[in-house]
């Protein structure tokens, strides 16, 4: 997704593995799959996703502005990366894969942690597209300062990137939530103003 609509999530090399999202019941049990390209609509079923927040060595968070061509929430600022795990793929592995695809950034799984394992949300964008996701949240910690982090954003996914202080991101979610994606707002409010601990 994405985020989250994920319409551009596959590539020619791996789209055969990336064409489906995992459908869930109200208790979070897997109940099947559905084509990723068609699952997001005004009647989106509950499905599995993830969100990732990448921090530099000083604790600044990488935020992205969704591409203007995205089906849902185009041009909206959000967390670093979101996506849909493949069948059999862990949340961490999915976050590594999508962050590389969307931003050209290689994350170290040893420096990542699922910090909000039970996060879920439902939201409707201005065009009527619904998101309904069980969406564990990952935080990844880099060993470099932001100025040494090399990024290569995919223009089909990402319009702009910025590094912001964690407190600033939290304050933005509290005071001007309309500037951010609804999932990023809810996640930041659950996190609170203090940096999550990642080894």
From Swiss-Prot:
Cofactors required: Mg(2+); Mn(2+)
Keywords recorded for this protein, A-Z: Cytoplasm, Isomerase, Isoprene biosynthesis, Magnesium, Manganese, Metal-binding
One cellular-component annotation, GO: cytoplasm
Record text on cofactor binding: Binds 1 Mg(2+) ion per subunit. The magnesium ion binds only when substrate is bound. Binds 1 Mn(2+) ion per subunit.
Positions annotated as active site in the UniProt record: 82, 133
List of residues binding Mn(2+): 40, 47, 84, 131, 133
Compartment list: Cytoplasm
Every Nudix hydrolase domain range: 45-186
SUPFAM superfamilies in alphabetical order: Nudix
Catalytic activity: isopentenyl diphosphate = dimethylallyl diphosphate
Single GO biological process annotation from the record: isoprenoid biosynthetic process
Listed EC numbers: 5.3.3.2
Pathway listed: Isoprenoid biosynthesis; dimethylallyl diphosphate biosynthesis; dimethylallyl diphosphate from isopentenyl diphosphate: step 1/1
Binding site for Mg(2+): 82, 102
A GO molecular function held by the record: isopentenyl-diphosphate delta-isomerase activity
Domain of life: Bacteria
HAMAP family xrefs: Idi (MF_00202)
Function in brief: Catalyzes the 1,3-allylic rearrangement of the homoallylic substrate isopentenyl (IPP) to its highly electrophilic allylic isomer, dimethylallyl diphosphate (DMAPP).
Membership in a protein family: Belongs to the IPP isomerase type 1 family.
Protein name per the record: Isopentenyl-diphosphate Delta-isomerase
Annotated gene: idi
């Amino acid at each position: 997704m994405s985020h989250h609509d994920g319409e551009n999530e596959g590539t020619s090399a791996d789209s055969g593995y990336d064409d489906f999202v995992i459908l869930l019941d109200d208790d979070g049990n897997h109940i099947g799959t559905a084509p990723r390209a068609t699952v997001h609509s005004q009647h989106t079923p509950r499905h599995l996703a993830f969100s990732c927040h990448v921090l530099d060595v000083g604790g600044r968070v990488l935020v992205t502005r969704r591409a203007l061509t995205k089906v849902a929430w185009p041009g909206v600022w959000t967390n670093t990366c979101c996506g849909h795990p493949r069948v059999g793929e862990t949340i961490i592995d999915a976050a590594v894969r999508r962050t590389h695809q969307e931003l050209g950034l290689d994350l170290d799984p040893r420096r990542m942690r699922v910090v909000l394992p039970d996060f879920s949300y439902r939201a409707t964008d201005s065009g009527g597209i619904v998101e309904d996701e069980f969406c564990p949240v990952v935080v990844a910690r880099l060993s470099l300062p932001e100025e040494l982090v090399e990024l290569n954003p995919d223009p089909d996914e990402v319009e702009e990137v910025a590094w912001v202080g964690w407190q600033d991101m939290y304050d933005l979610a509290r005071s001007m939530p309309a500037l951010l994606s609804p999932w990023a707002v809810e996640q930041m409010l659950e996190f609170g103003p203090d940096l999550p601990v990642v080894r």
